[in-house]
Each structure stands twice: as structure tokens, then as C-alpha cells.
Amino acid sequence: MAVFKPFRAVRPIPEYASRVAALPYDVMNSDEAREMVKGNPYSFLHVDKAEVDLPVGTELYSEAVYNKAAENLQKLETDGICKQDKSDCMYIYRQIMDGRSQTGLVGCVSIDDYMNNVIKKHELTRADKEQDRINHVDYCDANTGPIFLTYRDNAAVGDIVKAWQAEHEPVYDFVSDGVAQTVWVIDCPETIKKLSSLFAGIDSLYIADGHHRAASAVKVGKKRREQNPGYTGNEEFNFFLAVLFAQSELAIMDYNRVIKDLNGLTQDEFIAKISESFTVESAPESPYKPQEKHTFGMYLGGKWYKLTAKDGTFDASDPVAALDVSILQRNLISPVLGIDDPRTDKRIDFVGGIRGLKELERRAQSDMCLAFSMFPTTVDDLMNIADACKIMPPKSTWFEPKLLSGLFVHKLK
């Protein structure tokens, strides 16, 4: 019984949409953000990474940054660059990258659904990162970036979305960094009611990406409830901004590993050691991208190998233990290379599949010495782990394209 409701988005007027829309705050650092906003006073990074408008070296989690974010968000409205829709709407958001499209529905989901596990999680969050987004949402009095959610395919929802796209013109249609971004507004109360009713029949929503933003939005909502003991449950602070994608719309990319050294072993010793848990053979092609679960590409000494996990090296009945990232970590990266905590160990780094396998070769020939190419985690894997109330290992999933910020803002009042 998932709650999915319309809202009055604050969004750019069409002629400014491509200039306002920006990559999410957590895919670049402050210096990169400063470069990206040069010559563009309308970029949403002025809101999401407001330190770009403050002196270099400003403490990122300072009150000055959050105040500036709120000021810049208000300015976009005051200057007429962004306007709030006059009625509650839902929105269709389609992205096309490298010929593959993903289409989602934009609306609001319930903080209660998050707390009672209708919205399921698969990742741990860090208190410091949560607090940053809590402050950001609180000061801006808005959700400024959508949470990326998925759900098991529902044909009726898909039919409504396709029919609306066929019968209506988009309000935004532009290309950003090679990704086509198209948005339709669903402003028909009857269609909105149908969609809300269909989602009420869906048991679970799953966070694909944005665990920190979701946790923060919920904590702000709970805080507002405490400040307003007479709340009805219908106030906007009881809901947060999300884009919902059917499972079949999504493709998770590989999230690859590069390692600094062989932990004191020679190449021959290393291969002998890993052969206890994996079948090691020359890769059928170079570079090598695994074609099925429980197989891995390994680049070492200028050569690609294919690794296959041996029977008995993992528990196939455990959705976490059976993940390829877990198999590699438990049978090779930890026992052979001595990297027990991949979150903190400086001898390991992670390379998103968007960078390609040639990047693995480059890293292994420069600052690292060893690389592993992974078979991508599937959306099914993610859902099974969340259903079992378990946590995925770090760096298990890489989603592309990224959802842009600035096209939809959800005000909490």
C-alpha cells in the first residue's frame, strides 16, 4: 500500500530549464562545482552546493552555506526563473543515454511509508552526511533533489504513462551532457487519481539511490511534526520528492575495483593463492567484461584473466553472500589482499562502469597494479536484499544516467 501523491512543483520556465538543471550535489566536489557554474547564474548548483557563492575554504557544513542555499532558491522564484504550478500535478521524466531510455513518474511519497518499511532500504547511512542534508532541507524549506525509487513492473501504470506521452507535448526537451532530458506534466485530476490508486495497490517501493537524502527528508518531516503537534498528516512536510521507475526501466552498471598492490605476494604466488577459490584462465577477449554472475575479469601484469567462483565459496541462499561484490571481497580482496574494510582502506578504489574497461587498464598501469571488472548487480538483487531487510556491501551499484536536480522542487509548506 504505497502512497504516491501529486504536488505543486516549483520548476523552471521552459526557456531556462536546460540552464537550471544540474547534476546532483554528491557527484562532484566544491572545486568542480565552482567550475561548472561559471557563466551560469541559474545553475541549480547555486542551491545544492551553495558554497560556490561563498569564499573558497568556507566550511561546507556551516550555517552560511545553508542560508545561501535558501537565498538562492528564493531568488530563482523571485526573478521568475522558476515558478510554482498552480495545481497539484504529477510529472513524467524521461532520460535517454546511449540509445537507452528510462522513464519515471515524479511525485511525493510518504515519510510514514519510509518508517514502516513500505519504502525499503539496502544501504547504511552516515550521520554526518544525513545531518548536512537535514540542514539543507530545513533551511530551504524544500526537497531540492528527488529520491530515486523503483518498484516491480505494473502494466497499468506503464499504459497510463505511455498514453499521456503519446497525447501530450513535453514541457521540457533538451540535452545535457549527452543525455536527453524530457518532462511531461500530468495535470488531469482523473489521471492523477488513477495513478495514486494503482500505487496504493503496490506493496513495496525500493530506494535505488539517495539513501541519505531520503533519511534526511524523513527526519525533517518528523521534526516538523514535533513542532506542529496538531498536524493532520496532509501537510507537505509529511511527504518527500521522488522519481519512481518501474524495474524494467532501469539498468545497473558494473562497479569495478582497482587495487594498489598484491599485499607482498609475487604475481605467481598471488595467482596460486586465488586459485584456491576461483578457476583462473586467460580471458577470451581483451579487455574482458564478465557475461554472467559469479565470473570476474582480472587485469594484472598487462594481461586479462577470467575468474570463476568455485562451488562452496558462497552461500547461494543468502542474497547478500551470493552477490559478486561479496564473493570477491570475502574470497579474495580480504583474505588474499588484506583489505578488510573497503570503505576506509586506501589500497582500494572503485571505478563506475560509465568510465569503461580501458580506465581499469590505465589505473592498473599507473597508480594501481590490479583491476577487477564486475558483472553488474541486478535490480532483482537489490529488491531481494531489501525484502530480506539486509544491507548491500559498499559500492555494489552504479546507476546512469543521474537524475538532474532543479527540474522539480517540493516545498514543505
Predicted regions and their residues:
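Surface-exposed, charge/polar-rich loops and edge strands
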Residues: M1-K413
